[in-house]
């Protein structure tokens, strides 16, 4: 083999795996049907965070201190009634530890799919109540409330895991973000 062919073959071994990485797939957590994002609100579809998430499955809002105050408000208004103020669980399951009623929720793609498409019981789909961007922000707040060992938090990057402190509620009146 000539040197140019060897270099070309080597280059292809680097290019093909990158090209083979497909965008994440989103399915209804209950029936397995593909989620239809045409149902989503128009507002909040084209943010950089949403575009990045739909291409990679990575929520750039996770542990972003700038969005946490708004994320807390979204969670308080849409989720805390069932899941508890600190995601400790009420009539809905707890969301702040390493146990997931739907194991797919351990990933951001899975949690997003549950938010978007709904789950069993009283957890209806959120596509008519939250924008796609608001869903990502709400997910970031849920992830922020995590009380477990950071090594088990698959949604965090290695860098985020190194600096992550498990959530502990502060005394009444203190900012939780």
Swiss-Prot record:
Residues bound to heme c: 79, 82-83
Record's note on what induces expression: During growth on methanol.
BP GO annotations: methanol metabolic process
Post-translational modification: Binds 1 heme c group covalently per subunit.
Entry keyword set: Electron transport, Heme, Iron, Metal-binding, Methanol utilization, Periplasm, Signal, Transport
GO CC annotations, alphabetized: periplasmic space
Signal peptide: 1-22
Disulfide bonds: none
GO MF assignments: electron transfer activity; heme binding; iron ion binding
InterPro entries linked to this entry: Cyt_c-like_dom, Cyt_c-like_dom_sf, Cyt_cL
Subcellular location: Periplasm
Domain of life of the native organism: Bacteria
UniProt KW Aminoacyl-tRNA synthetase keyword: no
Cited function: Electron acceptor for MDH. Acts in methanol oxidation.
The protein's name in its UniProt record: Cytochrome c-L
The organism of origin for this protein: Paracoccus denitrificans
